[in-house]
Amino acid sequence: MRQPEGREVVIVEAVRTPIGRGHKEKGYYKDTHPNDLLGKVYTEVVSRAGIDAAEVEDVIAGCVQQFGEQGFNIARNAWLQEGLPIETPGTTVDRQCGSAQQAVNFAAALIAAGVHDAMIGSGVEHMGHFPFAAGMKTQEEFGFAFTPALMAKHNIVGQGLGAEMIADQWEIPRSELDELAVRSHKLAHQATEEGRFEREIVPFQVNGDTYVSDQGIRPDTNLEALAALKPAFKPDGKVTAGNASQISDGAAAVLLMSAEKAKALGLKARARIIDQTTVGCDPVKMLEGPIPATTKILARNGMKIDDIDLIEINEAFAPVVAAWRREHNPDMDRVNVNGGAMALGHPLGSTGARLITTLLHELERSDKEIGFVTMCCGGGLGTGTLIQRV
């Protein structure tokens, strides 16, 4: 592995909310403001670390749909709403589904460069209040992001159709996609039953109810039921509601410091950031980013895929995982070992920090050393973060 340039950056703490279904009537958080979700993980990550919140020099939050309740810099709003120090600034970033992972990566880079000593990388998304249709309605009123000039160069389509293109290019059968979905639910249910998520989850109270586990897991999911689902994006397609990620609500936060700062505060460094990357890829298929992101991380660190003990690849759509598996041939017993977004859910701007949080805790639980997170992102992007437990 390469030695990172600049100062060593360590993860001190990482937490997340239970992930709720993004359902207007049945979702955990149907009556919850996204500020409350993000604010909760801010308060908890500081409390668990046992530090004065004033030690945090900046907070970065990922969020995709930044308008309405999630507008006007939700990172700052959630921090202030919790009564945390006004001297700590905040900013909100959008790298589509990789937004929270990018928030963590940006924080790590700033610490490595010596700009700050302690930061929080985080993310939030309330898809129950902000379905994809909400963004389209806003564009209908205020103008469309994809101009004719852009579309002339890249005929951008929805992510579901991009997933179908990937399934076609890599000749992935529908049965393989459904098998990945069943695997995700089975592993997520097993992890929940065994209490694997308990340390990372912050219990969340709403209207007298306390939620401590993820809402979207369906332990009875089976191949027969999935095979009966209709294609979601084209009549003869392979991608369905069952082999794609769920519409979800949630938040996650990761507290990072320089190794020197953590030592000065008497804190245990739980992992260090070895490397990070972001890549661009075809903006039409758009979801193959984890393939080159993984290639780049491996090459730059002189590693093989088998050198990584645990991998979290976001299950935005099953074809993303299937194509990545074909290209990199990983041991799947090391991949998404506690399930993924098809079972747990995918609150867009939050998932990257959630994946890093889950990876950290699983490295500790299973006594493993090297972990990697990679995600596909809208617009043709891929993200990667390589960590080492210490």
Label each region the model flagged:
Residues 2-32, 224-288, 292, 299, ...:
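Condensing-enzyme catalytic core mediating Claisen C-C bond formation in acyl metabolism
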Residues 15-18, 30-40, 48, 176-264, ...:
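N-terminal extracellular/periplasmic Venus flytrap/periplasmic-binding protein-like
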Residues 28-143, 201-213, 284, 305-327:
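Conserved beta-ketoacyl condensing-enzyme motif
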Residues 32, 63-117, 153-159, 220-246, ...:
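Conserved catalytic cysteine-centered active-site region
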Residues 34-50, 74-78, 103-106, 160-166, ...:
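Short, well-ordered amphipathic alpha-helical segments that serve as non-catalytic structural scaffolds
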Residues 93-125, 167-197, 253-260, 326, ...:
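Active-site-proximal alpha-helical scaffold in enzymes
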Residues 164, 200-202, 274-343:
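Active-site pocket-lining segment
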